[in-house]
Curated annotation (Swiss-Prot):
It comes from Shewanella pealeana (strain ATCC 700345 / ANG-SQ1). This is 23S rRNA (uracil(747)-C(5))-methyltransferase RlmC. Belongs to the class I-like SAM-binding methyltransferase superfamily. RNA M5U methyltransferase family. RlmC subfamily. The gene is rlmC. Its EC number is 2.1.1.189. It catalyses: uridine(747) in 23S rRNA + S-adenosyl-L-methionine = 5-methyluridine(747) in 23S rRNA + S-adenosyl-L-homocysteine + H(+).
Amino acid sequence: MKCAHFDQQQCLSCRHIKQSMSVQVAAKSQVLSQLLSDFEVEQWHEPVFGPDSGFRNKAKMVVLGAAHQPILGIVTPTGEPVSLCDCNLYPEDMQLLLHRLEQFVRQAGIPPYNVDKAKGELKFILLTRSQIKGEYLLRFVLKSHKSIERIERELPKLLSEYPQIKVVSVNIQPVHMAILEGEEEIFLTEETRLSEQFNDVPLFIRPKSFFQTHPQIAAKLYQTAREWVAELKPSSLWDLFCGVGGFGLHCASKTIPLTGIEISSEAIACAKISAETMGLTQVDFTALDSTGFAQGCDATDKPDVVIVNPPRRGIGESLCQSLSDFAPKAILYSSCNPHTLAKDLANIQGYHIQKVQLFDMFPHTDHFEVLVMLVKPS
């Protein structure tokens, strides 16, 4: 992928952009192999990768500059603001909309938040795109309520030009800290969620719910998990750190009870809608801490198969101990951090690694997703 911003040293996020995808994936595979070198792996599956441009479905833009000349992008290593509306990680239609949003901010006259002076109103613009319909969820992160009227004044014109914008909200983040969003979310549209679909599973996105940023690879990851779980013929499933339900809903059926646990109530609300849409009745999605949930269950509640998809910190020693004690016949672990994955695998007792597969969800970076299946020795 070519990038003028990288060539000019304005944005260095895609640090491996000059390497081919095959070289990038080979390097990531080597890292993963080294991190898991202390474990016996029965099957190494071929890495999965896809498009290296036009794939990303979410933009997190810092709003810089001034009200009369706003810039959506980042601050360069030398301290200059630069627009990233034409970043090639985004689909072309998304790039065009980002340029239009710069114009929107200018027309609305909203002063960008100046971190050094702690003045201004508009901190971030967050844009999420649904791959299934090309529809959008648009969020304005403001310091206060002062500029909401300005957004509402210009919004009808924007929505008439871009009817594919289905959800618009304002998030209030009042503190002078490096925090992306605050607690208060104000919807400016009747719709409050974005429709998406991976494979044959309907999924829904709300402003604060986590969602994978590379839809093509995420779909393959979910499908692989579905196939691996199907081989196990489970009688019951847990999906911990379930988010909007992507893994569990791919693996569940009308005859297999599924328990999904996620700390975000917004994500759980989306997961419940998906389950209802799919006609799944033996499903229980609950907003709880996954570690606390597992610790509060007794042996009679233990699942046949457990899926975990934790944040970068991993599942931690307590949950590793709970899983070891429950001793399900298999554990599927999807990780975005191979370092914490290796640490957790060492703390889960009584299993061997049957399968490992790398999914390159983050081209041009050092990051990747990995799916591991742990089974009890026969």
